Swiss-Prot record:
May be involved in BMP2-induced transcription. GO terms for biological process: hematopoietic progenitor cell differentiation; negative regulation of transcription by RNA polymerase II; regulation of cytokine production; regulation of DNA-templated transcription; regulation of immune system process. It is found in: Nucleus. Keywords: DNA-binding, Metal-binding, Nucleus, Repeat, Transcription, Transcription regulation, Zinc, Zinc-finger. This is Zinc finger and BTB domain-containing protein 24. GO terms for cellular component: nucleoplasm. PROSITE patterns: BTB (PS50097), ZINC_FINGER_C2H2_1 (PS00028), ZINC_FINGER_C2H2_2 (PS50157). The keyword Metal-binding applies. Residues 151-178, 203-286, 646-691 are annotated as: Disordered. Gene3D superfamilies: Classic Zinc Finger, Potassium Channel Kv1.1, Chain A. The gene is Zbtb24. CDD domains: BTB_POZ_ZBTB24_ZNF450. Residues 37-103 form the BTB domain. It comes from the Eukaryota.
Length: 705
């Protein structure tokens, strides 16, 4: 109904009484379909999708929250201290103007409304209580439920507005399952006019939309099972082709995707006729089910034929959606849109806890579970919980008997195919991710992102104990282990303990290579070659011309030594000088022999931050490396565990060398031929003119040959 008011100037003012209801009904329909929703509210692991604009207009609580948030696109909030069912009813009131709840829940609903500052509901319920105390009894529906309609009009029969999501029906056959509870319904007209007039409609009844939960679906893949497409909803597609907000996971019931407004569907012949009769209660009836959408190739059943058409592309291999940048094809439009974000760098989904931006809503939901510690994915076979869907898929192979993807080169197994593809690059040498600044390439995109932080000087990860900053989170974790002093990783061969797992893995390779060397008696290797394999150095060779070399002797008082040669330098030989007890003998050391074709420049010796005062640059040959240099710099790290192992290795090899030869070796320089073995120790002199010069207990020695 529209009111027309003439104006003196000849203009007309037309007011529609149904426009606000139509807009609300349209927004409610969009919310059910997940269309254009830009916020997800999580209450007790239940996800409610909604529109920020309507929430802010209806609640001062949300209005202030969004004002502080700013424009960050898609967002997810976890609301603590609320009940999911109560919040679902309150959210339905915001979208429809109706409160549909049992009388015993009204107190909790009002408390939630007052907390969220939804004052329209508080005022409407107060007015309803005042009106309910009048002697005129309210009309009852088929289950004895009083129905109260609040309107701003006097004595006008309530007319159905176009687009309203629910309608009134006459009494039908059958008894409602809701008869056990008294139900109260309120309708509020959200105009600015007075809302104190009430009209009781005697013939109107309503059906609670929260129908009883039906039988859970069978796991997908079996004949007769029901599967909904797992793809995320596309906001640009036709809303009519969308499904409801809830869907079954292929392997489990995902609790976080559950919704109070979930409507189950039923296949013909799936349940007995009694369940059908129960749903034929007062209120509107469900429309007749559409013909069964079954795949002829794998016998899977889908809710809509639209999903079946998308699924059949898996069998036909059809990929109609092509990327304009790289030409990659996709079976779904949504998959193409997500892929395009890789080229554009768009990350529309932002975590409200740590502000991390992600490309898809699915990845944001999994990321949020890391903050909450909740494991939202459940195995329907054994009931085990997982925080990520890929973990559930990997676990499900235990029940299906399918093996994990395995690398053909090293037989290592992975959780999914994507991880295997990344791993295969380590064997093939493929490095598709290239730095635009220096041209260095990487096998993984995450490695490139970490590398770019080095150019920018970004170190977002800091140690809470010493304050040292890192550009990589994994480097920070490895550093924090040093503060604990714990060495939880022990070698099963020699019982040597390590603080980090990667050091243990590198150490285990030593034993495997030693066993291989002992088994192959025909193949002999020098001590220097074996030590080089221990440290996994690149096979640098000495120059034939025999240019300058430098030798560094470092005692075991230093935990980690980083030797950083310039691109013109190369590490040729790494060996351990003999010592009876490295733990007690300060003369125990590691010898690094390096060569360079030109003059020694930019040679830097560095250590951990707390040991910086014990390490000095070699001032006689240049103390700083050119910071503008963009060529790659090779870094060799010698940990304390490596020093201990090298000493143990040297004890084994030195036992076969006569003691008389030791003095003879100190009098002659080492061979500088390419690939020469370290059979003689070079004569060393201290850098400082004073004999036996040390820096903070760390002996630095150099020799020029």
């Amino acid at each position: 109904m529209a009111d027309t008011t003439p104006e003196p100037s000849g203009h007309l003012i037309v007011h529609s009484d149904t426009h606000s209801d139509t807009v609300l009904a349209s927004l409610e329909d969009q919310r059910k379909k997940g269309f254009l929703c830009d916020i997800t509210l999580i209450v007790e692991n239940v996800h409610f999708r909604a529109h920020k604009a309507l929430l802010a207009a209806s609640s001062e609580y949300f209005s202030m929250m969004f004002a502080e948030e700013g424009e960050i696109g898609q967002s997810i909030y976890m609301l603590e201290g609320m009940v999911a069912d109560t919040f679902g009813i309150l959210l339905e009131f915001i979208y429809t103007g109706y409160l549909h709840a049992s009388e015993k829940m009204t107190e909790q609903i009002l408390a939630t409304a007052q907390f969220l500052k939804v004052y329209d509901l508080v005022k409407a319920y107060t007015d309803f209580q005042n009106s309910h105390n009048s002697p005129k009894p309210p009309a009852l529906n088929c289950s004895g439920t009083p129905v109260v309609v609040i309107s701003n009009k006097k004595n006008d029969p309530l007319k159905r507005k176009r687009g309203r999501p629910r309608k009134t029906n006459s009494l039908q056959e059958g008894k409602s399952e809701l008869a056990a509870e008294g139900e109260v319904q309120l309708r509020v007209n959200n105009s600015v006019q007075n809302r104190q007039n009430f009209v009781f409609k005697e013939d109107s009844v309503r059906l609670n939309e929260q129908t009883p939960k039906e039988k859970e679906l069978e796991p997908a893949g079996e004949p007769g099972s029901v599967e909904e497409m797992p793809a995320e909803k596309d906001e640009n597609s036709d809303p009519k082709a969308r499904d409801g907000p809830g869907s079954q996971s292929r392997y489990s019931k995902r609790r976080t995707r559950r919704s109070v407004k979930l409507k189950d569907y039923k296949l013909s012949g799936d349940e007995d006729d009694q369940s059908t009769a129960k749903r034929a209660t007062c209120g509107r009836q469900k429309r007749s089910s559409a013909p069964e959408a079954r795949c002829k190739d794998c016998d899977r059943v889908f809710k809509y034929s639209h999903f079946l058409a998308i699924h059949q592309r898996r069998h036909t291999g059809e990929r109609p959606f092509k990327c304009s940048e790289c030409g990659k094809g996709f079976a779904q439009k949504h998959s193409l849109q997500v892929h395009t974000r890789m080229h554009t760098g768009e990350r529309p989904y932002t975590c409200t806890v740590c502000s991390k931006a992600l490309t898809t809503k699915h990845s944001l939901l999994e990321h949020m579970s890391l903050h909450s510690g909740q494991k939202s994915f459940t195995c329907d076979q054994c009931g085990k919980y997982f925080s990520q869907k890929r973990q559930l898929k990997s676990h499900y192979r235990v029940h299906t008997g399918h093996s994990l993807p395995e690398c053909n080169h090293c037989h290592r197994k992975f959780m999914d195919v994507s991880q295997l593809k990344k791993h295969l690059r380590t064997h093939t040498g493929e490095k598709p991710f290239t730095c635009e600044i220096c041209g260095k390439s990487f096998t993984a995109k995450s490695s490139l992102q970490t590398h770019i932080r080095i150019h920018r000087g970004e170190k977002p990860y800091s140690c809470s104990i010493c304050g040292k900053c890192f550009s990589d989170s994994s480097a920070k974790r490895r550093h924090c282990v040093l503060h604990t002093g714990k060495k939880p990783f022990s070698c099963p061969e020699c019982s040597l303990q390590f603080a980090r797992l990667d050091n243990l893995k590198a150490h285990l390779k030593i034993h495997s290579k030693e066993k291989h060397a002992s088994d192959s008696s025909s193949v002999s290797g020098s001590s220097a070659d074996e030590v080089r394999n221990v440290l996994q150095l690149q096979p640098y060779q000495l120059s034939a011309s025999g240019e300058q070399e430098i030798q560094l002797l470092v005692t075991d008082s230093v935990h980690n030594i980083n030797f950083m040669p310039t691109p013109s330098q190369g590490v040729s030989i790494v060996a351990a000088e003999s010592s009876q007890n490295m733990a007690t003998d300060p003369a125990a050391n590691i010898t690094l022999l390096t060569q360079q074709p030109e003059q020694l420049q930019g040679l830097i010796l560095s250590a951990q931050q707390e040991q910086t005062e014990h390490i000095q640059s070699l001032g006689m040959i240049g103390s700083q490396m050119d910071t503008s240099q963009t060529e790659p710099v090779h870094v060799i790290t010698l940990s304390k565990e490596t020093l201990e192992h090298l000493h143990a290795h040297q004890e084994q090899t030195s036992s076969s060398v006569p003691a008389a030869d030791t003095g003879a070796r100190a009098s002659s320089p080492p061979s500088t031929r390419p690939g020469a073995e370290l059979t003689q120790a070079p004569l060393t002199v201290p850098l400082d003119p004073s004999p036996g010069a040390t820096v903070g207990g760390v002996a630095l020695w150099a020799v020029l040959l």
